[in-house]
């Protein structure tokens, strides 16, 4: 299968999941999780119509950003983010998916203010309670969210999670549901709009869409197994 065929197959599956969930057309945005994917492959997928990509490593992202500057791409940052790397993302990524602590929020505020922009972010929540993963614990989410409300150059648009990897996607459903419930609770309690839920990857994105995902992060199904 070539790039365009792989892309259209994934888009078709997204569409069907949206319909099953009764959520209407284009209910979830497809983000190409392009860690380790070379610029020429991204260019190929761009020519097939995929314009949204997410990177995990700042250094790798900056190289691709420069190499693909001639394309009208929408870049997201989806990996764990060190405070000393925040400055390199300003003005280059439309959405940071991995805000999970106050000092990172402070740094994004500082750098966004310097650049005279408002940086859109998602708060990453560790719904599975896994020690190896980033993300704020669900019980500390409100505290972090309240903290961001005081930062004029940081705008939270929703939540993100990387749930435990389980063979059967159905077993992941409770984690996706939990994230949606946490988002709904914040919206009610603080009377704010948090339109985005970034959840679901190659093996479980359909279940994520059924549970309310608005952004799915797909790597393997588009680009093949990762070459580390």
Swiss-Prot record:
A GO MF term: pyridoxal phosphate binding
Pfam families recorded: Ala_racemase_N
SUPFAM superfamilies attached to this UniProt entry: PLP-binding barrel
Keywords, in A-Z order: Pyridoxal phosphate
InterPro entries for this protein: Ala_racemase_N, PLP-binding_barrel, PyrdxlP_homeostasis
Gene Ontology cellular-component annotations: cytoplasm
Superkingdom, taxonomy of origin: Bacteria
Modified residues (N6-(pyridoxal phosphate)lysine): 35
Record family assignment: Belongs to the pyridoxal phosphate-binding protein YggS/PROSC family.
Task of the protein: Pyridoxal 5'-phosphate (PLP)-binding protein, which is involved in PLP homeostasis.
PANTHER family with a match to the protein in the record: PROLINE SYNTHETASE CO-TRANSCRIBED BACTERIAL HOMOLOG PROTEIN, PYRIDOXAL PHOSPHATE HOMEOSTASIS PROTEIN
Protein name per Swiss-Prot or TrEMBL: Pyridoxal phosphate homeostasis protein
Organism: Aquifex aeolicus (strain VF5)
């Amino acid at each position: 299968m070539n790039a365009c065929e792989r892309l259209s197959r994934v888009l078709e599956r997204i569409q069907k999941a949206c319909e099953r969930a009764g959520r209407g057309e284009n209910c979830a945005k497809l983000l190409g999780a392009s860690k380790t994917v070379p610029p020429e492959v991204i260019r190929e997928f761009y020519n097939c119509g995929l314009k949204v990509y997410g990177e995990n490593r700042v250094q790798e992202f900056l190289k691709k950003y420069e190499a693909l500057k001639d394309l009208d791409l929408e870049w997201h940052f989806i990996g764990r983010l060190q405070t000393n790397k925040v400055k390199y993302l300003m003005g280059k990524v439309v959405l940071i998916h991995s805000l999970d602590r106050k000092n990172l929020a402070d740094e994004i505020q500082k750098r966004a203010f310097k650049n005279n922009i408002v940086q859109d972010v998602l708060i990453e929540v560790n719904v599975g309670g896994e020690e190896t993963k980033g993300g704020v614990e669900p019980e500390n989410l409100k505290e972090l969210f309240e903290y961001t409300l005081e930062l004029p150059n940081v705008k939270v648009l929703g939540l993100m999670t990387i749930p435990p990897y389980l063979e059967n996607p159905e077993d992941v459903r409770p984690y996706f549901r939990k994230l949606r419930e946490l988002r709904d609770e914040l919206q009610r309690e603080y009377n704010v709009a948090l339109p985005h839920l970034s959840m679901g990857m190659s093996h479980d994105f359909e279940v994520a869409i059924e549970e309310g995902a608005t952004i799915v992060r797909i790597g393997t199904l588009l680009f093949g197994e990762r070459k580390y």
